[in-house]
Curated annotation (Swiss-Prot):
Source organism of the structure: Salmonella paratyphi B (strain ATCC BAA-1250 / SPB7)
One Pfam family matching this protein: SelO
Active-site residues, Swiss-Prot/TrEMBL: 248 (proton acceptor)
Gene this protein is translated from: ydiU
Cysteine disulfide links: none
Binding-site positions, ATP: 86, 88-89, 109, 121-122, 172, 179, 258
Protein name in the entry: Protein nucleotidyltransferase YdiU
Enzyme class: transferase
Binding site for Mg(2+): 249, 258
Domain of life: Bacteria
Protein role: Nucleotidyltransferase involved in the post-translational modification of proteins. It can catalyze the addition of adenosine monophosphate (AMP) or uridine monophosphate (UMP) to a protein, resulting in modifications known as AMPylation and UMPylation.
Length: 480
């Protein structure tokens, strides 16, 4: 089957990009590709044949129909207007046309210098491409909206970061790479007609049912806000901290995008900061819902030329509603509740307080709770708490709450085990794969990808364990 590509972004939004070609790496070689995703997209296996070199995965060739561009956008970074940004190391190669008429961006990260590289070198390093490939696939299999990773290419090109590292490229796929920052770019350049063109593009291609509706812009922004709310709720329920929620890292489609200094909670710490450059804790775990709203407010400002203030405020209210509703639903599922009752939040917050005092592992606590039987006086979960009396008091209230529902243990446990993962991408697991890959051993990278495809399967190995001492509180930076 021949892959078909279109260039809607290039054809319809000429002010938003610079056309250019990727700059290949030295001795580039394919070290990993996403076989399952490739099969779903009917990508010919021959394209992954190592005897053909790095090919399109390393920017050495283009496929018919590809029209590569680097996109320009702006944004607020750490709450401060940063001005023009853009694809400083990435190139949108083209948009794959799928059988249902939708498209999928092929975006090559680490593809070389662009007009938007600023002081950078246009490159990505092996460490960061491995982290993004693992994180995006982990999030996908957790059921969280995200970009996807299709391939990683390593090379002999040296790249200087804090130390000298190895240049690499990642092929990232997404329904769209449209960001809040695209709208900010033209708003602050005082070009409102181009802001409206971006909105028209989004509605035409992603919400076509509203094209001929009088209130199409208000409806569209309301949906952007709701998607963002549901996304943040998903992050909070799995203990995911993005690390760098700048407005240029926010997706119009409500996707998790731009994996940098992210981290999944080990010990439950609501103030967890994944990014060691975030000295003020702006992007700490428990502040993500507030930051997302702040970012939506910045986006709303750009839409004031063609959406009424009241409609914008209604959309922002929709964010809060979507966030709280979705978060509540997810957390009740994690606790094994099939109905909503007025004291559920209090019971959840009591558990969180107990976990915070004890330094309980976030993922393991909920997974172990999903195996606990109502009638059990003792359990492996109880044994993880030092203050057994406090746990017993909470568990008695929890057990009483479960008894209000006509659901047996087996059905409850089944539901809980579908939403409480046994495995998440802890930073130490990613680092172990990176360390091996930097020595030329890709086995752990491939093995970890396979493990992350089954996050709700119980394991008795270290993929589901608490981190070792060296793996606790690993510092992660924005450097990529």
């Amino acid at each position: 089957m021949t892959l078909s590509f279109t260039a809607r972004w290039r054809d319809e939004l000429p002010a938003t990009y610079t056309a250019l070609l990727p700059t290949p790496l030295k001795n580039a070689r394919l070290i990993w590709y996403n076989d399952k995703l490739a099969q779903q997209l009917a990508i010919p296996a021959s394209l992954f044949d190592a005897t053909n070199g790095a090919g399109v995965w390393g920017g050495e060739t283009l496929l018919p129909g590809m029209s590569p561009v680097a996109q320009v956008y702006s944004g607020h970074q750490f709450g401060v207007w940063a001005g023009q940004l853009g694809d400083g190391r990435g190139i949108l190669l083209g948009e794959q046309l799928l059988a249902d008429g939708s498209t999928l961006d092929w975006h090559l990260k680490g593809a070389g210098l662009t007009p938007y590289s600023r002081m950078g070198d246009g490159r990505a390093v092996l460490r960061s491409t491995i982290r993004e490939s693992l994180a995006s696939e982990a999030m996908h299999y957790l059921g969280i909206p995200t970009t996807r990773a299709l391939s990683i290419v390593a090379s002999d090109t040296p790249v200087q970061r804090e130390t000298q590292e190895t240049g690499a490229m990642l092929m990232r796929l997404a329904q769209s790479h449209m960001r809040f920052g695209h709208f900010e770019h033209f708003y602050y350049r005082r070009e409102p007609e181009k802001v409206q063109q971006l909105a028209d593009f989004a509605i035409r291609h992603y919400w076509p049912q509203w094209q001929d509706v009088a209130e199409k812009y208000a409806l569209w922004f309301e949906e952007v806000a709701a998607r963002t709310g549901r996304l943040i709720a998903e992050w909070q329920t799995v203990g995911f901290a993005h690390g760098v929620m700048n407005t240029d890292n926010m997706s119009i489609l409500g996707l998790t995008i731009d994996y940098g200094p992210f981290g999944f909670l080990d010990d439950y710490d609501p103030g967890f900061i994944g990014n060691h450059s975030d000295h003020q804790g702006r992007y700490r775990f428990d502040n993500q819902p507030s930051v997302a709203l702040w970012n939506l407010q910045r986006l709303a400002q750009t839409l004031t030329p063609f959406i009424e203030i009241d409609a914008l405020n209604r959309a922002l209210d929709r964010y809060q509603d979507a966030l709280l509703t979705h978060y509540g639903q997810r957390m009740r599922q994690k606790l094994g509740f099939f109905t909503e009752q007025k004291d559920d939040n209090a019971l959840l917050n009591e558990l969180f307080s107990l976990m915070a005092r004890e330094g309980s592992d976030y993922t393991r606590t909920f997974r172990m709770l999903s195996h606990t039987e109502q009638q059990s006086a003792s359990s492996p979960l109880r044994d993880t708490f030092i203050d057994r009396a406090a746990f017993d008091a909470w568990f008695d209230r929890y057990r009483a709450r479960l008894r209000t529902e006509a659901v047996d243990d087996a059905l409850r446990q089944q539901q809980m085990q579908r939403v409480n993962p046994a495995v998440v991408l802890r930073n130490w697991l990613a680092q172990r794969a990176i360390d091996a890959a930097e020595q030329g051993d890709m086995a752990e990278l491939h093995r970890l990808h396979e493990v992350l495809r089954q996050p709700f399967t119980d394991r008795d190995d270290d993929y589901a364990s608490r981190p070792p001492e060296w793996g606790k509180r690993l510092e992660v930076s924005c450097s990529s």
